[in-house]
């Protein structure tokens, strides 16, 4: 839960911008080219624009935002994108204004508060590794905090690896004229993760407190080969095959977690 500082009396609107970025990876092993193609098709359908729109709509509700506009698109051959423009308060009463005013209100908030998601399925051409990445950005202006949606987003997607960045920018001024560069307490993104999530993941932080930049990356602690096999069971594989596949998957997870290729 976000812990606010003592309530400030502000001069005008709260101008702080809070941005939360997610990179979520799902890693899989598919033995044949046909299985890898079916994995891509499965992921493409599982996380199509309609499903992603529902997830982001839920995020808007969780953080207490009002939806202004939704744009979504499925791509050929694969992938999807959704952008939702949001505001802290209802911008306009549709019954009291025409379409032109509503459109202007949407444009005015476009660069301030929004939620976006883009998906990137891909496969290794030879080794059977297939990955799915979802990039999610939640940017808010005002008192709304994107950190409230952390746990929901992790649970909603198949999150083997999660890389998160949170930053606060701008300032808000109180009635005495003093500038405030953050309006809640935080020393790590981990502060806002549920206990059951923290117990399942290995986590690592890089934070720059004086710049209000917070970075957390995490991956699942337990490795169950069956959870990574597509259309296959570990019990049907030979010991040698299991060891080979497990090594490939663990290497892929390690490289994605650290963001660099490991030496042979």
Curated annotation (Swiss-Prot):
GO terms for cellular component: cytosol. Its EC number is 4.1.1.50. It is an enzyme of class 4 (lyase). It catalyses: S-adenosyl-L-methionine + H(+) = S-adenosyl 3-(methylsulfanyl)propylamine + CO2. The record marks 112-113 as: Cleavage (non-hydrolytic). Transmembrane segments: none annotated. This is S-adenosylmethionine decarboxylase proenzyme. It comes from Stenotrophomonas maltophilia (strain R551-3).
């Amino acid at each position: 839960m976000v812990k606010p500082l003592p309530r400030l009396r502000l001069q005008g609107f709260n101008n702080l911008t809070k941005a939360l970025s997610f990179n979520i990876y799902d890693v899989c092993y598919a033995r044949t080219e046909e299985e890898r193609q079916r994995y891509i098709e499965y992921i493409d359908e599982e996380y199509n624009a309609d499903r992603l729109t529902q997830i982001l709509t839920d995020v808007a509700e969780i953080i207490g935002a009002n939806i202004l506009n939704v744009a979504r698109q499925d791509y050929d051959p694969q992938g999807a994108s959704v952008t939702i423009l949001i505001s802290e308060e209802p911008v306009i009463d549709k019954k009291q204004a025409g379409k032109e005013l509503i459109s202007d209100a949407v444009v005015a908030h476009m660069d301030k508060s929004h939620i976006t998601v883009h998906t990137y399925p891909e496969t290794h051409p030879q080794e059977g590794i297939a990955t799915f990445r979802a990039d999610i950005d939640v940017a808010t202006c005002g008192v709304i905090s994107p950190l409230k949606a952390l746990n929901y987003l992790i649970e909603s997607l198949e999150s083997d690896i999660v890389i998160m960045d949170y930053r606060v920018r701008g300032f808000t001024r109180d009635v005495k004229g003093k500038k405030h560069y953050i309006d809640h307490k935080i020393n790590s993104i981990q502060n806002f993760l549920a206990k059951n999530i923290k117990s399942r993941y290995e986590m690592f932080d890089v934070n720059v407190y004086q710049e209000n930049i917070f970075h957390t990356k995490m991956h699942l602690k337990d490795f169950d080969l069956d959870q990574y096999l597509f259309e296959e069971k570990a019990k049907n594989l030979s010991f040698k095959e299991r060891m080979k596949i497990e090594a490939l998957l663990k290497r892929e997870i390690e490289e994605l977690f650290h963001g660099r290729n490991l030496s042979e």
